[in-house]
Amino acid sequence: KNKINKIVEFGAGLGRDSVFFAKNLIHTIALDYSKAGISIIDQKIKKQNLTKYLSTKLFDVRKKLPFKDNSVEACYSHMLYCMALNNQDLQNLNDEILRILKPGGINIYTVRHTDDGDYENGIFRGEDLYENDGFIVHYFSKEKIYSLLNGFSNILIENFDEGSFPRKLFYVANMKNVINQ
């Protein structure tokens, strides 16, 4: 709808969504913390001849994002915000996304929410973080989503289910304000 030509995916994992974007002729930069994940995406790029539309970068999103100010049309992440990131990490990431997005740019992300069946199960690690089977998940309320809107306008928050459990998620779309403070 917004005719996005270039997108950055944070927490690309094994590249499912990055490959989808590239196959739909959207120039995609896939960032992930895992060398193994990046290696798998690189193999998919070669095997599926996607070098024109998809590139990768090994990167920790807790650091300053490797892009110039106001240079990116759209950012996307599927459950990255649910990783073991505390509220300050999330605010820093969101501030960095705000910095790199062009005015009117879109940040789309998905998060597990507080109606999820695993919420409040396992070991409480603070800030709506729960550890289950050695894996920490950060759960979101709508209030937490709204708290990350500084410099953004919310376009959409939509509930959806994923998997057979199913996981309960929010799909969030925010637009960078054209004029920021």
Positions of PLM-derived features:
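Short amphipathic alpha-helices and their capping/turn segments at secondary-structure boundaries
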Residues: 65, 94-99
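A short, conserved alpha-helix within the catalytic core of class I
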Residues: 84-96
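A short beta-strand submotif of the Rossmann-like class I SAM-dependent methyltransferase core
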Residues: 77-80
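Short glycine-rich, flexible loops that bind phosphorylated cofactors or substrates
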Residues: 83-84, 116
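Short glycine-dipeptide loop
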Residues: 101-106
